[in-house]
Regions:
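N-terminal targeting leaders characterized by basic, low-complexity, disordered sequences
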Residues: 1-4
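Mid-to-C-terminal functional-domain signal that highlights helix-capping/loop sites
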Residues: 6-396
Length: 396
């Protein structure tokens, strides 16, 4: 090129390499579209894991009574409820396991055992760890089987409120390190119509041919504390759930032996990987409670204390069983119950009701009931959470 030659610069064409840049641009656009699709379609998870105000719940009437109300680090529905699971007769479990690469339920696995009107069902804790809430129906009763792994607490409720069954989910929030659920009200309430821009929603009873279709107004959900069995915020704040009696946590071997006609729930297809990854065994073995506790009772401040019915000073994570009958409560450690009920049934009285404890060792497994078939409330949990929810100021 001479001094008088035109200034010719190389140009990038599609064939000479421009296709690489074009492809990169398309990939960037696809990634951005994927990243924002959930937001644009309203599917972005609610809750940033840190601030309770980001979870989309009405907290204007929040009732914690001194308890520590915090975010769990996970968004709402990070653990999704298991709704109306498939079930298998318990006596078929051996054959079911034989078809699997990894066995589903074995003899030493812990389960939540529920019995209603002569029908029994087991909910393995490995499944509960990845769902925390199971919306089910047993013997015609709609129930919510709930498990808070941080507290090792299992409670089962009749999920009807004002005669209507609710669906419960995992809010991603905690009260004194305990599970806080929410009701999926929008799925079960009646549609409402708005008569004007300023009018309050009214129930849509009928619609004439010349009327517009009703406008669906999704009502706000309420928050429910597992240990309190009560709504702590939202439209039905202060409402309590009916606790299903005679619920036990024991080994699958123990439950099947005492309930030979039991069923057992089956996991969702996608649960297998999560069940392998999610384990609380290390957490339960160390002494630290990971989330803050706002209330801590002494034996003198516990609700319904009676002489010799409350253990003395214990580690926060000591497994206990709270037995409530006749207006009184007795709390025993899992170890004591396992030791005293192993060779022969351990019998004592709570609130005038004869209680019988039958246990197995290695691993410790305990079944608690009343010898005269009186319904009793049995609450297996860790000691710290029982204290937190049974002070005079706790929601109850």
């Amino acid at each position: 090129m001479t001094e008088n030659s035109p200034d010719i610069r190389p140009s990038l064409t599609f064939r000479s390499g421009g296709w690489v840049i074009a492809l990169a641009g398309v990939l960037v656009l696809l990634i951005l579209a994927w990243a924002f699709a959930g937001i644009l379609m309203g599917h972005r998870p609610k809750g940033d894991g840190q601030s309770v105000d980001t979870y989309g719940f009405d907290l204007s009437n929040l009732r914690t009574n001194g308890g520590a109300f915090v975010a769990s680090g996970n968004p709402r529905d990070f653990f999704q409820s298991l709704d109306h699971p498939k079930v298998l007769p318990g006596h078929e479990m051996l054959a079911y396991n034989a078809k699997l690469r990894s066995k589903y339920v074995v003899t030493a696995d812990r389960v939540i055992g529920v019995e209603i009107n002569g029908k029994s069902r087991a909910y393995p804790l490995d499944v509960m760890n990845v769902h925390e809430v199971v919306n089910d129906e047993l013997a015609g009763v709609p129930i919510a089987v709930t498990f808070s792994p941080l507290c090792d607490s299992a409670l089962v409720f009749d999920r009807r409120v004002n005669g209507k069954p609710l669906q419960f989910g995992v809010s991603g929030l905690l009260l004194d390190s305990n599970l806080v659920m929410y009701d999926k009200q929008a799925d079960v309430v009646e549609h409402t119509s708005l008569n004007s821009l300023d009018a309050k929603p009214t129930t849509q009873v009928s619609m004439n041919a010349d009327q517009s279709p009703p406008v669906s107004a999704a009502p706000a959900s309420s928050l429910w504390s597992q240990m309190a069995g009560m709504a702590i915020a939202g439209p039905v704040g202060g409402t309590t759930l009916t606790q299903i009696p005679n619920v036990n946590v024991c080994t699958w071997k123990h439950w099947l032996a005492t309930h030979p006609t039991t069923e057992v729930i089956l996991p969702d297809a996608q649960d297998e990987k999560r069940m392998k990854k999610i384990s609380y065994s290390r957490y339960l073995l160390n002494s630290k409670v990971e989330f803050p506790i706002g209330r801590k009772a002494t034996a003198n401040t516990l609700i319904n204390p009676s002489s010799d019915n409350m253990p003395g000073a214990m580690p926060d994570k000591m497994p206990v069983i709270a037995i409530t009958a006749g207006g009184e409560t007795r709390v025993v450690t899992l170890r004591e119950a396992a030791d005293r009920g192993a060779d022969a049934p351990w019998n004592f009285v709570v609130g005038g009701v004869p209680i019988v404890v039958v246990s197995q060792k290695d691993p410790a497994s305990v079944l608690v009931g009343s010898s005269d078939t009186t319904p009793i409330q049995v609450t297996p949990c860790l000691w710290f959470v029982w204290q937190a929810f049974h002070t005079p100021t706790a929601p109850h």
